[in-house]
């Protein structure tokens, strides 16, 4: 969800509130794409914690304890119901607001269930063409949340909501609740997504270091990118392609280094044989097949985008800063060289007869001129930024890459002496995606002490100490299913 900046603009600020040492003042959005298969959205700044899912049931009634208007809920599991406007008229949008707003919301995940949710301290932290993002505090738990408010077409279910309701992973922003509210105009309906709040973005963290003329510390690049690839492995296993991977959509907690993928406004369940629009993804991070106008692309477009993010963190600037769709392709060719006819056919067969200027590939070691760039990082980049979509690494193959070996070492920690965030709390579902990689993905010190170090054989029974070292998170389920999954990979 890019900001509404002028066409051809650079990556804008995130528009988020100042909340930590990494925070910067909010900025404007970036530009839109152009040329063949031009992106409809540029690499603009985005608002705070965002997400989505389809319009299922859950009517809304909203009220304010300070005497604001109240409304009746409506709608059931078949579609959205109308309630009162959000924020209610008369409720001050400011940090000092003592007003408490109560709505009847539907729980974000699990069986459909409605409950009253009260929140306070409402303030705007982001906006764009998609709508508005507010920050609020849940009255009962005092937990900060982000509330993304988008105009809902009553004729259709909201794809973002449908997708968000089915996703449950420690590296994906969690949908807590959702509710509907009416707008100022007659029959105007809004969907409000109540999401967990994460204070920063990779974009702003990287900009913090860039402004200080520094490159983001390599340990942070490893921790952030590993979690991004893990989130992609999960959503791709669910058949979902994000279609807008960029630093602004990667939320991070600067203290714990936990990363959560957000903004599923462009996401889609890809079905083989069904066409998809090519004018998606912010320009700097668009896979070449999208620039060529392909409509039968795969989730490997997310892998290309992730490769662009990795390169940007290593370089301190975007690797392919095109001013338009065509210029974007020129920037890619300047690094990868002119694609062969076979590579063009793999991206879009309609362009095989198009005459491109013959340019040799630029050596990756010269792309990353700094001697401080680890060879493993360069090797990983080159394996992600491939013209042929099927030649790119899968997200889990990226997680298993030697660039991330440091994270799998016993005793690895963050520069602030905190433990690494949860990296190895794999669910049985994750371990079943590419079982042949499990022997690499699970660090040696977390494997069963009775079995050989590699490959894994009959079981995986981590000790309590090993679980502590793994910083176990919500996805870990030490059950018979885990043992069975690992056993099947031998």
Swiss-Prot record:
The gene is Gsk3a. GO terms for cellular component: beta-catenin destruction complex; mitochondrion. Residues 481-490 have a biased composition (Low complexity). It comes from Mus musculus (Mouse). CDD domains: STKc_GSK3. This is Glycogen synthase kinase-3 alpha. The modification Phosphoserine is found at residues 2, 21, 72, 77, 97. It catalyses: L-seryl-[tau protein] + ATP = O-phospho-L-seryl-[tau protein] + ADP + H(+); L-threonyl-[tau protein] + ATP = O-phospho-L-threonyl-[tau protein] + ADP + H(+); L-seryl-[protein] + ATP = O-phospho-L-seryl-[protein] + ADP + H(+); L-threonyl-[protein] + ATP = O-phospho-L-threonyl-[protein] + ADP + H(+). One of its GO terms (biological process) is extrinsic apoptotic signaling pathway in absence of ligand. Phosphorylated by AKT1 at Ser-21: upon insulin-mediated signaling, the activated PKB/AKT1 protein kinase phosphorylates and deactivates GSK3A, resulting in the dephosphorylation and activation of GYS1. Activated by phosphorylation at Tyr-279. It is an enzyme of class 2 (transferase). PROSITE patterns: PROTEIN_KINASE_ATP, PROTEIN_KINASE_DOM, PROTEIN_KINASE_ST. It comes from the Eukaryota. Constitutively active protein kinase that acts as a negative regulator in the hormonal control of glucose homeostasis, Wnt signaling and regulation of transcription factors and microtubules, by phosphorylating and inactivating glycogen synthase (GYS1 or GYS2), CTNNB1/beta-catenin, APC and AXIN1. Requires primed phosphorylation of the majority of its substrates. Contributes to insulin regulation of glycogen synthesis by phosphorylating and inhibiting GYS1 activity and hence glycogen synthesis. Regulates glycogen metabolism in liver, but not in muscle. Residues 1-97, 451-490 are annotated as: Disordered. The keyword Kinase applies.
């Amino acid at each position: 969800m890019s900001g509404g900046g002028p066409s051809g603009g650079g990556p804008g600020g995130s528009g988020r509130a100042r909340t930590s040492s990494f925070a910067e003042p909010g900025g404007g959005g970036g530009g839109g794409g152009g040329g063949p298969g031009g992106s409809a959205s540029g690499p603009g700044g985005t608002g705070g914690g965002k997400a989505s899912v389809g319009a299922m049931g859950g009517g809304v009634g909203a009220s304010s304890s300070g005497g604001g208007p109240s409304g009746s809920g409506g709608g059931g599991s078949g579609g959205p119901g109308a309630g009162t406007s959000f924020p209610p008229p008369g409720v001050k949008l400011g940090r000092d607001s003592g007003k408490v707003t109560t709505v009847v919301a539907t729980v974000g995940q699990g069986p459909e269930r409605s409950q009253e949710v009260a929140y306070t301290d409402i303030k705007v932290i982001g906006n764009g063409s998609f709508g508005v993002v507010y920050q609020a505090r849940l009255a009962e738990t005092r937990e900060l949340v982000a509330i993304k408010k988008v105009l809902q077409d009553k004729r259709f279910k909201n794809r973002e909501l449908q997708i968000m309701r089915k996703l449950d992973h420690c590296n994906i922003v969690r949908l807590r609740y959702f509710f509907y509210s009416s707008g100022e105009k007659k029959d105007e309906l809004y969907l409000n997504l109540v999401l967990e709040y994460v204070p920063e973005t990779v974009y702003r963290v990287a900009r913090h270091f860039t402004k200080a003329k520094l490159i983001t510390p390599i340990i942070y690049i490893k921790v952030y990118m590993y979690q991004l690839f893990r989130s992609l492995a999960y959503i791709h296993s669910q058949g979902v392609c994000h279609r807008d991977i960029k630093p602004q959509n990667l939320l991070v907690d600067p203290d714990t280094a936990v990363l959560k993928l957000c903004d599923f406004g462009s996401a889609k369940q890809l079905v083989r044989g069904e066409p998809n629009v090519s004018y998606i993804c912010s320009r700097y991070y668009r896979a070449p097949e999208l620039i060529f106008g392909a409509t039968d692309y795969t989730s490997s477009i997310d892998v290309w985008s992730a490769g662009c993010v990795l390169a940007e963190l290593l370089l301190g600037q975007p690797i392919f800063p095109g001013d338009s769709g065509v210029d974007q392709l020129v920037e890619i060719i300047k690094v990868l060289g002119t694609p062969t006819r076979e590579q063009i056919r793999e991206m879009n067969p309609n362009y095989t007869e198009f005459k491109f200027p013959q340019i040799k590939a630029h050596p990756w070691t010269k792309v990353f001129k700094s001697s401080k760039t680890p060879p493993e990082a360069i090797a990983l980049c080159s394996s992600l930024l491939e013209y042929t979509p099927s030649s790119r690494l899968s997200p889990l193959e990226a997680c298993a890459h030697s660039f991330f070996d440091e994270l799998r070492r016993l005793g690895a920690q963050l520069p602030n002496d905190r433990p690494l965030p949860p990296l190895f709390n794999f669910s049985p579902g994750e371990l079943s995606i590419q079982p042949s990689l499990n022997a690499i993905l699970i660090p040696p010190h977390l494997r069963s002490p009775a079995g050989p170090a590699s490959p894994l054989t009959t079981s995986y029974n981590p000790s309590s100490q090993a679980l502590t070292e793994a910083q176990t998170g919500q996805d870990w389920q030490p059950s018979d299913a885990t043992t069975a999954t690992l056993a099947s990979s031998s």
